[in-house]
Every structure is written in C-alpha cells, then in structure tokens.
Amino acid sequence: MHPDVEQELAYTLLIELMAHQFAYPVRWIETQDHILGEVNAERIIEIGPSPILTNMMKRTIASRFSNSDQALNINRHLMSPDNGNPDIYYKYEPTEEPDLPELGSQSNTVKVSGSPAWEVQRPVTASHIPSGPVDEIEDTKVPVSAILISLLAPKLKKDPRAIPMTGTISNLVGGRSTLSNEIVGDLLAEFPNRVPDKPEEMPLSSLSETLSTSHDGQLGKATSALVMKMVSSRLPGGYSLSNARLYLREKWGLPPRRQDAVFLLALQRQPTSRLLSSTDVDSFLDANAAAYFGQENLSIPSRGSVQSAAPAVDAKALLLAKQQNDALLRDIMGVIQGHTAAKNESQDATLQASDSEAAATKKLDMWISEHGDDYAKGMAPIFDAKKQRIYDSYWNWNAQDTILLFQRKLQGQMSSVKELEQLSTSIVNRACGRTLEQLDYIIAQAERDPTVDSGLLKPMQLLRQTCVETQERQPVFINLSPDMAPLTTISSDGRLIFSEIPRALPCSKILSTNEASSIAFPVSRADGVAVSYSPQLTEILCHDLKDSRRSGFSFSGKNVLLTGAGEGSIGNHILRHLLAGGARVTVTTSSFSEKVTAMFQSIYARHGSKGSVLRVVPFNQGSHGDVQNLVKYIYADASWDLDFILPFAAISENGRDIEDLDSKSEIAHRAMLTNLVRLVGAVASQKRQRDTITRPATVVLPLSPNHGLLGNDGLYSESKRSLETLIPKWSSETWGSYIALAGVIIGWTRGTGLMDSNDVIAQAVESLGVRTFSAVEMAANIVSVMGGRFNAECQETPIIVDMGGGLGSVKNFKAKLTSARQELNAYAELKRLTAQESSRDKAYVATDAHAKTSKRLRGRANILLPLPKNLNYEVDIAPFAASLDGMVDLSRVVVITGFAELGPLGNSRTRWEMEESGTLSLEGCVEMAWLMGLITYHNGIDKKGDHYSGWVDTKTSDAICDDEIPGKYLEFMAKHSGIREVEPEISDNGYDPSKKESLIEVALQRDLAPFETSIETAETLKRQHGDKAIVTQDASSGNCQVQLKAGAVVMVPRASRFNRTVAGQIPLGWTAKRYGISDDIIEQVDPVTLFSLVCTVEALLCSGIIDPYEFYQHIHVSQFANCLGSSMGGLTSLRKMHRDRYLDRSVKSDLVQETFINTTGAWINMLLSSSSGPIRTPVGACASSLESLDTACDLIMLKKAKVCLVGGFEDFVEDLSYEFGCMKATCDTDAEYAAGRVPKEMSRPTASSRSGFVESQGCGVQVLTSAELALEMGLPIFGIVAYTSMAADKAGRSVPAPGKGVLTNAREKSTIPNPMLSLGYRKRLLELRRTQIYQNISDHLDILNSEIALFQESETASPGDLKAFRENRELRIRQDAQAQDAEVTFSLGNQFWKSQDAGDISPIRGSLAVWGLGIDDISVASLHGTSTVQNDLNETMVIQEQMKHLGRRQGNLLPCVCQKWLTGHSKGAAGAWMVNGCLQMMNTGLVPGNRNADNVDEKLREHRHLAFPNTNLQMDDIKACSVTSFGFGQKGGQALLVHPRYLFATIGRERYDGYISKRDKRWRKACFRLSEAMVQGNMVSKCIKTEAPYTSADGVAALLDPTARF
C-alpha cells in the first residue's frame, strides 16, 4: 500500500475512533477484556501526551492476566509516545558514526505545508546554527523594600521614587484611615503571620528589616495578584505569564526571583492600554529588564555567534511553532479527557488506592473493634485558643450590682436575705473609690426622698461603712454556705421529692457524729508509700475551716487551673469561691457553647472580685493533644504560672459492672486518670524548663471513698484509687520540687451531675451514720483547704484530707443502700396506687355536677398599640405644676406622638419585647407570625367544611389557636429574625456572601465556537471587539453567527466567598403586600420606600391617626412636613441602574427617580399625606435619623410646620456590605465563627472583644407635632424633644473617623451659677413681663375709648361702624398681647438660655433647665454604640466629658444603653430605632442591658460617670434621656428627650384631664384599626390617597388661604 494511502487511512481511523469515543459511553472494562482476552493483543500503543490508559491496563494485566499470559507465553508490550517512540516507529539505535565535518553549504529542508495537522513533523536541519541562549545569572531574593514600594505606589498614586523609606504608612496616607487599613490588609496577605503589630506606625525601612528576617524572597499573594492582573489586562490575548518568564530567562538569563523583581518594576511602568502584539511585549519586557540590570549594576549579557553559510532559523518562530503544536495536542487531549476523564480517573484512583485503603480499613476496623466508638469520639481534641473568653471587668459589674441592690431593696424585690448577703459581699469584695461615690450618692438621694423607708437607709449605710473599711484590703472568700441536711418526701400521688433543710444542730456537733472517727475531717501525711494520720495537720485544718467562716481567705495573685466546672458541680461552686477571693482562674469546658460561656460570664459578673480574672477555653481531658496544648497555652504568658490545679473533670459510668465495661469506661478512665497524670506532668515540665522551684503548683487530687463500695460504676473506682499512687511518686520521682499534692477524699455530695440520681436516698444514707454534703458545702471545704495554712504544709509533703463523711466505714453499705432504696420506692409505689384508687373512688361516687370539669380557657392575644403610662396627677405631676405652669410656649414645644419601625426584630413592639426579656409574649408571637406570613386570618368555610373565624396556618390552611402559635412557630421565628446568617431569598438580587459574584477580565487564548445572535447584538460585538469578532449572517434566519477570536477580551463571572456572612435582615417572609400595598406600587418603588410607607402608617396609628387627612381639620396643608432621611437611599435601584444596566438586564426606564434619597419622602406625600409643606431630606450617614429630628424641631420651633414625619431608612445590599468590609468597619464573621461566636453574639458594643459592627436594614419613623396641637387633638405624647443638635469635628483626612464636635453641646465658660437657671427666678421675671403686657392692654383700651369718643363727636360714623371698629381694634390689641405673651414666654421659658451671654449657659444645661431639670436628671444615655473599637471609645469619652464639665455628681452613674447588640447597625435608621427605645424606656422605667457585653473594655473604666449594664435595670423614674449618633463625614448628633409629665405640669389639672379623655378615646379607635388591618391586610392601602384633601377646583384657593381646613 502506498505510504500516502496508509497515512490517509490512519488519519481516517483516528477520526473514526475519536468520533466513536465522543458518541458512545466509555466501556473501559469491556474494552480491556476484549483487547487482552479475546484478541490477546501483545503490542498495545496509546495515542496521547501521557500514558494514562496504558498505566491502567498494566494494573489490569497484573491483577487478572499475569498467570494466563505466563501459561500461554504471551509477552505484552504497552507503549505510549513518551516512553516508546523508537519502538512505536520500529526505530533502533543507529551504529556509531564518525564525527561530521564542519557544516558547509548543505541545506536540508522539509516540505511541511501539505502535511495533515496531526502529522508529527520531522526536525529541521539547518546549515547555520543560531546564537545560543545567554548564561543564567545567579538568583537572589526579591528585596522586601521593593515589594513594599510596589504595594504602596499604586495605593498612594505616587511615583515610587517619591516614597521615602523613612516615612510611615500613617504619614504617607495623610490621615486616611480607610486607605491605611487597606494597605495593612495587603501586607497581611503578602506576608502572612509575619507582619508586626501596628505596621502602619513603623518607618518603611524598619518594617522592611522586620519582614526580611523570615521572607523567602518570592512574591506573595498581593503582589502576585497585581502581576497577574497586569498580564491579563495589559498584555495581548494568548500571551501568558509563563511566556513572559520564558522570554526573560532565554533572552536575559534571569532566574525566577530576578524575574519577579522585573515584574515589580513593570508594575510601576504599566502601559496605559493593552499591548497589541508580541513585539510590543518584547519591547516592554526589554525596557524593564534593562532598567533592572541598571538598578542592580549588572552587565547586560551578550550572545555569542557561530559562523555559518546557512541561513539561521528564527528561534522565536520555532518557539511559536512549538507552542502551537503543544496547544493542538492539549486541545485533542482535552476533548478526549472530557469524555473519559471522570471514569478513568475514578478507576485509576480506585486501583491505586485499593491496596492501601484495604490495609488502612483493616487497621481502623481493628482499632475501633478494640476501643469502641465512644473512645474514638472521646479523645477527639477540641482545644482552640481562638475561642477563649476572658472576663476581667469586675469594676463594671460592681457598679451594676450596686444599682441592682438599691433598686431591689427600694422596690421590695429582694427575694431573700441570702441574695442580699451575696450581693453585699460581692460589692465589698470589689469596692473602690467609685463604689464609695456611688453609695454616697444613693444614700444622699434616699435621705432627701421622703417616700424612701428609713429601713432601707441603714443597710446601705452599713454597706458603705464596710466598703470604707475594706477598700484597701485584698478580696477574700468567706464561707457563707449554710449547713443543710437532705430531706426526701413522698407526695400524695407517690412522687419522690428531694429538698434540703437547715440542720437542727450546729455544724460542729453534726460532724462529730461520724461513726468512723470523732474528728470531722481527719488529715494524713504521706511519707513515701506510708500514709499516717496527723493530729497536728488535722488541727490546722480545723482552724482553717473556722477562719473561712470568719475572716476568710484571699487568693489574690493566685493562678488556678480548674477542669470540670459544669453547672451544679463541685467545681462550679469552687470557681465562684476562688473568684470571690480574687484568683485568676483558667477554667475548661468540654461542652463549649453560647449557653456555657454565658453561664461562666454570669458567675464572674456576680462573684468576680478585685483583680480576679476568668479565662474559659474548650478542652477535652480525654485528648492527649488537648492536655499538651492547654498547658502550652497557659505558659505562653509567664504571668499565668500556676499555683493550683484542680482536675475535677469526670465522666459518669453509672450502670456498668465488670461484665458491661465498654469504650465509655475506657475513655472515662483515660480522662480521670491517664490524662490527669499527663496534665500534672506537663505543668511540672513547664516549671522545670523555667526552673520555678519557689512556686510549686498544688494539685488538689479528687479522691473518693468509693473503692468499689457502690458498684456498677465502671472503672470510676479504679480511676480514683489509682490516683493515690501519685502520692508515693512525689518523693520517688523528680518532679516533687514543682508540684505539691493535696488529696481530698470527697464524700457523698448531693446535687452534682454524678450523684443527682442518688439524691433521693441521701437522707437514708445519713441514717446509716454517713455525713452527706451539698455541692456548695463541699466546694467551700475544698477552697478552705487551698486557702489556709494547710496549703503551706502540702509543699513539704503530700497530704490527704478525708472528707468522705464516714462513707467508707459502713459495713455492707451497698446492701443497706439497696434495701433503703427498695423500701423508699415501695412506699412511694404504695402511695401512688392508693392515690389512683382514691381518685377512682371519687369519680365513681361523685354526682354528675361534681364530675364535670370546667373547660380550659384558651389564651388569646390582645395586640395593642403603645399608650403612655397613665400618671397619677397628684403624685407624678402636681409637685412640678406650681413652678412649671405657664412657663413654656406650647406652640413651640416639640413632642413625639407616635413611632414605628421595621427591622430585624420586626416592629417596635416585638423589638422591645426581645430587648426587654429576650423572648416574645403571646401577643408578640402572634404579631411576628403574621408579619412573617406564617399565619393569616380566615373568616369563612374551613377545610372541614365548618365556618371558622380565626388564624390559620398559611401553608396548610389548618386552624390554629393563639396560644398554639408560640409552640409551633417561635423557634422558626427566632431562627429567621434578628442578627443571623444572610438569607439570599430575601436579599437584594439574591445576594449570597458565600457566592459573591464579580467579573474578571480574560483575553481569549483560542477561538471560541460560533454562537447565534441577533444582527443588532452582532453589530455591538463587532464594534467592541473589532477584528477579534467574526460575524457571518444567515440569510435564511436573518440572525448572525459570531465567533470571538483569540485575543478578544471578555468578562467572565466568578464567585468568591466574602467573609461578612451575618447581617440583621428584616424577618423572613415580610412583604409589603401583607399591608395592602398593590403590586404596581411594589414594582414601581424601591424596597426602602415600602419600608417607609409601612412605618409611616404605623407611626400615624400609634399617634391615634387613622386617616392622615385628619390633620387638615386642625392645620393647613403647608404645615405638614416630611423630614425622613437616609445615608444612601434606594440602594436596590442604584444597583439596577449601574450593574443591571451594564449587564443589559431588563431595567425600567424611569428607574433613576428611585435612586434619589428624597424620592421616598415624595412617595409618602403622594400616597399618604398630600401635604404642601416642606420635604427636608437629611443625609447624615449613620446620623441621618438624628439629623432628621433636628431638622423637624427647627421647622416646628420656627412655626414653619406643626406636624413632621421624621426618621430614617436603609437597605442591606451586596455592594455596600462589601465596601464596609473592605474598610474593616464590619466584623469578620469567619473570625467570629472561629472564636466560637454565634451570629447573635457578633455585635458587642463596649465589649473588650468587639471587632466591628454588624449591618442591618429597615426603617424608623416618629411623628412630631407641637405640644399645642397634640393637646388639642388628644394625640398620645410619648416624650418631649428638649434639645437637638448636629456638630462637625475638626480638620483631618479620615471621613469615617469618629469626632468630638458633639462636646460643644456642653459648652459654657461660667463656673458661677446663672440665676436664670432657677425656674422660680424665671417665673418671677415672666410674671413681671406679663403684668406689663396686661397693663399695656389696659392703656391701649383707654386710647381706643378716646378714639371712639372723637368719632362719636364727629358724627361721621354710624353706631354699627363704631361697634365694628371697637371689636376689630380690641381683637388686634388682644392678639398683639397674646403674641407678646407667647414671645416673652418663649424667651424666658423654651429657650431662655439662648438669650444669655455667649457661653454662659450650655445648650444641654439650658434645655434641661426649661423643665426644671439638671444634668443629674439625665437617667440614661442611648449610645450609637456600633461595636467598632474607635467609636465606642470616642463616644463614651464625649458623654463622660459632657457630664464632668457640666458638674454631674460623682457616684450618679449614667447607665449606657447600646441597642445595636440586638438590632445591628442600620445606618440611616439607627437613630430612629434608638429614639423609639428611649421612648419605651421612659414609658416603662426599664433600662435594658446590653446582653452581649460579656466583658466591658478596660479602657472604659476611666469614665467614672458611666455604667455599662448587661442586665435590665428597673428604675423608678426616667426623667430624661440622651441620644447620640455619629455618622461618616463628620456628622455628629445629640438629642435630649424629657418625660411628658413635665409638659403636663404646664397646663393645669382640668386641661390635663380633658386631654387624657380625648387621648384614650383616640387610642381605642387606633387599636381597633390595627386589629382590623391585620385581619383584612389593608393597613397601608386604606390610607393611600388618590386625591388631595381638597377638590381640584378649590386647589389654588386652598393653598393660598392659610385658614383653609378640610
């Protein structure tokens, strides 16, 4: 056959094989069987770049055909191009030939143009050899300084030569903290785990030296990304980074690291646009390489040459041909592997791993079979230092406890003397100068208050005296545990009930009744293996026990490791005692969770004393690794060198005898013995390494008298008994200098996890002569052993204390115990049966009337709007009425008559319930379930065919009663509301932080397959890509085929994971449609407008306004203003306008209008209020709501409006979330999860561990009116807006930096009290001015009489004219007088302080004095409290300095509320939510605690006027609140709200009673409307207007007539 025909057939065969491969599924096993079995092929060749199939076939031959091949003498040869080229082509080693002569003019050329693309080309032989590559120069590390400059230059937008190495990052960025954070983030990415603390404050030269010490000389993540970005965006398509490296190596001889240095230079010299050809790239690389050689003083390499008569073959052409050939082979293999890779790789991996997996599986099965699952799980390590919790803010909890003590005593809420004793002891143990100031203030206030019982003063005075006496001493643990005896009773229905009662006899006498010994706790001394009773040590212990109840023991400065401190355990009570004594304790927990850490935090908050510290870490004592890591963690800080070790961790093995020992018994033995010993040894090793022989750690060994005594407890007894062998080892081994041993034989202890099932027989045990103990008693005894003189004796020799209570000395104890248990159970069973029989007898003999049981009443929700608390006029108002009556101009007093919100916790009512109690009431559950769409109201035929009126499940339509709603939906509501993982289903554009979309620019390296599109689209593609887009038109369809060629630049979507995955979204299921808003409006407006519409209607309902047009019965349409603000407005619309429009998605044509921030206010006016008054749209970032409040107050006080809607709104969207994350303003949720935090813990204002705010979304609205209008209409008044102000900061370069401009609200220079601050003084001045006004009226009336007399004499006017003239003039005279009265009242009342000399009276002092209040009357401060480090420090400093400057009394601590721990930070809406919270606080007197403030920042301790409660404080009276907000862009805002009782004191009893009557009537109607709206789903739709309050014909006249009402 002719070679050309063979070649053609081979080509056809290959194509057919590939087509078959593509068209049919891979059947590799059958193929192998056919080739190897049926055909018995011996010569097998694989076509491809690597031997994938032949390797798999080799394993098949070895496993299945090796024996048969040997028997049949079959010799198989498996070949592939990479290892069998000569054999494939039947080429053999040529014979050796003599050296060729010098190359001459011969020229060997091969014609290749006619060869098929797949044909392997033969090498070209040229008569002229080109110049060879240059020699590679020696490699060297990339200097860190070059990397730093490369990172800084593009960020600073400076020439690299203009960046001095002596400068710092902070100086270079010019105060722009965001840019500084960004650069530091790049450094952390470039040099992971090597960047020093605060690198931005180090000179670049020092930073470079520091980083150079451990740098590997290669580019890191940040610079590599910059280089890759340059290659993809500036070099032509198809030109990769590897091409550039190859060019630099071959032409310039540069090794990899020097290539990196050239790329760094290239970053600084990037072309402004993409290079178009490889020639341009070569020039670009040559220029940068030459610059590098010059920079490094290297000689530019020269190439050698070889003379030849033949023309040289272009090396670049050869390289290009090779690259094209390689690309072709990759394409072919890619096609093949695309159809075979999945199965082949799976089979390959299976074959390779089968043997090793089988062996590993066999070994694992054997291990599991021997040890068991419990053992395997029980030794899994859980220690993680990142999850540590540190509690040391005892100073704040002491202030909180002092407030709680006084409030509970004052309100009669102290549950017992024991609680009073505990609180008082805790306060004394933490007393400092601040505590004394606080007590002084409380006592002084109580003495001045005639309503305070004198019996309250005495304990407070005694407490203060004790604090004075103990202020300088160290904290002490005092054993206050009562001596309790067990008591078991049996109820009438046969239930066993365990309780504890005080023992009848003194403790000392009870202890002496032990059968085993006449001494309570005998002490033995160990001498090697010999253990002997020591009367002297026993006596010492007795004295220590007595001292523990008298003077107590201090553990100040002592470091303790405690394992096994679960709730109710002995270790848990030991922890309380140690903290009370001032110890620094590291406690471990094997069940690390939010609940567990909260338990330990509450223990520290109550018992932690001066200097005490509590560290909590996860730890599994069954894990050897955890033991080692725990000890390393402790000794990483030398100040934590241990003084005591209490290894009390234990695992219950109840119910296991020697026939039932299992893997749990083994892991329990490992935890309670093996690893306990390892723990002691690891500590000894650390002390040995540090040569700490003067500070041995005392190990309290938890021994047991139960040496098999009780039985059925697995290996518990063996574990405890084996611990005793440590005692002789103390002297026989070498670690005795570092460890002291105190063995404590722990007797029967009631109420612990190991013994709680036996509590009911404790009384029977004591009847056997055994002393049992409560967990509190046993813990106090053990701590007494640690704290007294007894501990010093342990340092000399191991000691054993027998606190077994005689348990080990009772003969036949198990039998007696079993008998007692049987008797008890038998008696209980008898009573149970008797009770059952008695019940049956009663049922039998009872009459029908008695047998009937009343039907249980079902709980029903009564959802009501908030109503200001009814006040007792004589008690709450009358005391102020005498001085305040008539002292303000009510038309210019601003009051809040209604409020509403939509946020992560639903509306303002459900949010307050969560803030107040942490759960929802029945009403809250029903409202939240309705709001989330879980229930809907049904009135009609139900599923059963009956008529039903009530709530039904939205999904199933099943009827559901109100009281069933919490049980069915509460868990779901809690999961899908509040701060939580971002839920894509309710996020804008389905945003999922785990799949954050972005585009990357890619230059195509090969032609894409053609795709069909329209002519218009084809034209746009051609316009963009030019000759890189080939367009062909299909005449039949009219469409085009477009093919993008290599070099075309396309944007490819990618999904990355963003580490801000938690936010405070509105509750899942919320929809505006539920409020009756139509689909066309929902489709038209931005989501924030929907939020605002709902909140506006609900705020109006809260004001008692069912129809917004009701206002126009009392005011003109020009007197209704809208001041809602936001930081960014319609973010969803902004995203659509920019991103969706760019991506050519469907976007409505009028979208741009929804991006304007003022559009929301416009929609509210167009749909609801139809006002002609001002629309003010404040944009104050996070302070937008307070700026809105400030704007509205100005409008009302200037009489430009009488009603204002105020507040703010904000959305949560992907872009804003990402940008906040880039600024490091929000918390890194990945780091939070790594620290063991759950989403609801991640917003922690004022906490020492806070790390940034958590975003949220929503809206908040208040209705503001003048007090005069509110009283006239009977609107509920929730608070007086006494003062508002906005303030900027100072010169700087950081936009988000928190400012101090709000301090100006306290500006005043005079230290001498201004008499105008006296309400009585101003009242006298006002009365004097009013007398003058009244006299002026009389004078003008006399003049009027004279004028009328003249008219009468002239006889020119009729009597009717004279009468009209008199009436008109008298009216004007009296109106002028009223205006003068209002003006003088305003100047001497509302804003008297503004008329004083500049700086004489501060705005805060003056606005409070208007209502007869002072700086000490501010009862609570609602902080912006974002949970960022700098804001919380700055804001508290501002409030502290205001209080200090204005003379707030020492000890009058101002509770600070940080609402964002619950709601997150909603930016524009945040201030409105805070105002709502303050109104609710004033109405209830409750100050809610920041429950996420587990440990308050030590830096806040210096603010002596402030307190940071993490629990609720019930105050008797909240007179005034301060609200502060700080927004990006130097927006600082502060408002003062005052309780409405002070307003009511200005109007008189009669007017007040009339107002209350109108208010209550209005409130009842509004509540009915709220219920109706929930049932009918028309809360908003019923208020939506289609026409103005006036007819179109009357429109002009209505606007021009100020007296027009509708």
Swiss-Prot record:
Residues annotated as domain Ketosynthase family 3 (KS3): 996-1539
Pathway membership: Secondary metabolite biosynthesis
EC number: 2.3.1.41
Positions bearing O-(pantetheine 4'-phosphoryl)serine: S177
Domain of life: Eukaryota
Top class in the EC scheme: transferase
Induction / repression: Expression is positively regulated by the apicidin F cluster-specific transcription factor apf2 that binds to the eight-base-pair motif 5'-TGACGTGA-3' called the 'Api-box' that is found in all promoters of the apicidin F cluster except in the promoter region of apf2 itself.
Keyword Transferase: yes
Catalytic residues of the enzyme: C1182 (for beta-ketoacyl synthase activity), H1424 (for beta-ketoacyl synthase activity), H1465 (for beta-ketoacyl synthase activity)
Keyword Oxidoreductase: no
GO molecular function terms attached to this record: 3-oxoacyl-[acyl-carrier-protein] reductase (NADPH) activity; 3-oxoacyl-[acyl-carrier-protein] synthase activity; fatty acid synthase activity; holo-[acyl-carrier-protein] synthase activity
Domain Carrier intervals: 142-218
GO biological-process terms attached to the record: long-chain fatty acid biosynthetic process
GO cellular component: fatty acid synthase complex
InterPro entries according to UniProt: Acyl_Trfase/lysoPLipase, Fas_alpha_ACP, FAS_alpha_su_C, FAS_alpha_yeast, FASI_helical, Fungal_FAS, Ketoacyl_synth_AS, Ketoacyl_synth_C
Recorded catalytic activity of this chain's protein: a fatty acyl-[ACP] + malonyl-[ACP] + H(+) = a 3-oxoacyl-[ACP] + holo-[ACP] + CO2
Usage in biotechnology: Apicidin F, like the other known apicidins, is a cyclic tetrapeptides with anti-malarial properties via histone deacetylase inhibitory activity.
Keywords from the named record: Phosphopantetheine, Phosphoprotein, Transferase
Protein family per UniProt: Belongs to the thiolase-like superfamily. Fungal fatty acid synthetase subunit alpha family.
Physiological role: Fatty acid synthase; part of the gene cluster that mediates the biosynthesis of the cyclic tetrapeptide apicidin F (APF). The non-ribosomal peptide synthetase apf1 incorporates four different amino acids to produce apicidin F: L-phenylalanine, D-pipecolic acid (D-pip), N-methoxy-L-tryptophan and L-2-aminooctanedioic acid. L-Phenylalanine is the only proteinogenic amino acid directly used by apf1. The 3 other apf1 substrates are non-proteinogenic and have to be modified by other enzymes of the cluster.
PANTHER family on file: FATTY ACID SYNTHASE SUBUNIT BETA, MALONYL COA-ACYL CARRIER PROTEIN TRANSACYLASE
Protein name per UniProt: Fatty acid synthase apf5
Originating species: Gibberella fujikuroi (strain CBS 195.34 / IMI 58289 / NRRL A-6831) (Bakanae and foot rot disease fungus)
